[in-house]
């Protein structure tokens, strides 16, 4: 593997000194870029794009050609794991992801098998190894998965949900069934993420997109417990250096202390959290990633630059901060505004790393 030329993202996650605050964007390979739209049209549909390792590599690299980003993230989807379990993933126009065979009974859960990442998910591993090779050491490659709870919400609901009625009914009326599902998913995610590391991922992120829908105690029981299990089972060293792990629960600002106890290296923050407060609470234990509101990228560029300065000042001096948005970039953002955001982070953060 080529030697890493820019490792400030990995260094910041491990709280080692950096020259400027590293920055990348969730969904940086996405629909706001005209070149992404062209490649997706070539693929035909979203899952065909994910399953073609050469095109997945191409869209992963596209934002790096435009912007001075400090990390690349595998182009894939969190629902690859339930898809590999045979649920029949498809995308409904305007509806988002759907499953032909929801996992909403204990019998359906018992029948689920744990997918082999090198077989049913081999297309993801091929994408990881291709991207790592094509990066040629420019920046680190982030691998990722959805959290067991978040994957389970889609599997039980049969797709996206605003109320989470079916999975919450299972959680409170049939908790043993849900725990069986979450346990299988945790085992699947451990294998999946470790295979990503074996194929070249240099950092890992667990996206708990819907953990914030849970009550205080239910979050610990149904989400955090299974993310803890995953962290305990992960490969933490590869290529002679640590593989940092970032946990991100959207709406998880209440639980930062509990999340920091898992042994992860960093916590992702959404835009509802004050980063200065987060650093006071858990900054002695973990690095922090975030956390500008993605909608701020619709603002005039001077306002974006002002907000970047506000967040950098909130975090303050020293390492341990990876700048990002508080969630994925919106599809209608002007690419020039994204570029101004990235430049502002690097330019304004130098003063905090003397």
UniProtKB/Swiss-Prot annotation:
- Pathway the protein contributes to: Porphyrin-containing compound metabolism; protoporphyrin-IX biosynthesis; coproporphyrinogen-III from 5-aminolevulinate: step 4/4
Q: What is this protein called?
A: Uroporphyrinogen decarboxylase
Q: Which SUPFAM superfamilies match?
A: UROD/MetE-like
Q: Where is this site: Transition state stabilizer?
A: 77
Q: How does it assemble?
A: Homodimer.
Subcellular location field: Cytoplasm
Q: Which organism is it from?
A: Shewanella baltica (strain OS185)
Gene of this entry: hemE
Give the family, as the similarity comment puts it.
Belongs to the uroporphyrinogen decarboxylase family.
């Amino acid at each position: 593997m080529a030697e890493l030329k820019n490792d400030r993202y990995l260094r910041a996650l491990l709280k080692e000194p950096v020259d400027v605050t590293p920055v990348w964007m969730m969904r940086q390979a996405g629909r706001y870029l005209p070149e992404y739209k062209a490649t997706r049209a070539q693929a035909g549909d979203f899952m065909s794009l994910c399953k073609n390792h050469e095109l997945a590599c191409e869209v992963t690299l596209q934002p790096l050609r435009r912007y001075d980003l400090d990390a690349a993230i595998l182009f894939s989807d969190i629902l690859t794991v339930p898809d590999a379990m045979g649920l029949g993933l498809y995308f409904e126009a305007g509806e988002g992801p759907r499953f032909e065979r929801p996992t909403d009974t204990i019998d359906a859960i018992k029948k689920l098998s744990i997918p082999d990442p090198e077989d049913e998910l081999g297309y993801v591993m091929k994408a990881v190894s291709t991207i790592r090779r094509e990066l040629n050491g420019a920046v680190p490659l982030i691998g990722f998965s959805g959290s067991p709870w978040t994957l389970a919400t889609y599997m039980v609901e049969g797709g996206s949900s605003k109320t989470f009625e079916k999975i919450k009914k299972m959680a409170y009326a049939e908790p043993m069934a849900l725990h069986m599902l979450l346990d299988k998913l945790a085992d699947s995610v451990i294998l999946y993420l470790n295979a990503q590391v074996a194929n070249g991922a240099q950092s890992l992120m667990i996206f708990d997109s819907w953990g914030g829908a849970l009550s205080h105690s239910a979050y610990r029981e149904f989400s955090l417990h299974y993310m803890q299990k995953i962290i305990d089972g992960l490969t933490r060293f590869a290529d002679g250096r640590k593989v940092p792990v970032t946990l991100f629960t959207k709406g998880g600002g209440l639980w930062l202390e509990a999340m920091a106890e898992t042994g992860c290296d960093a916590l992702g923050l959404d835009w509802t959290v004050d980063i200065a407060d987060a650093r006071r609470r858990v900054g002695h234990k973990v690095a922090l990633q975030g956390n500008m509101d993605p909608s701020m990228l619709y603002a005039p560029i001077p306002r974006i630059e002002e907000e970047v300065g506000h967040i950098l000042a909130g975090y303050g001096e020293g390492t341990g901060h990876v700048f990002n948005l508080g969630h994925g970039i919106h599809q209608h953002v002007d690419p020039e505004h994204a570029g101004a955001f990235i430049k502002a982070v690097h330019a304004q953060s130098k003063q905090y790393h003397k």
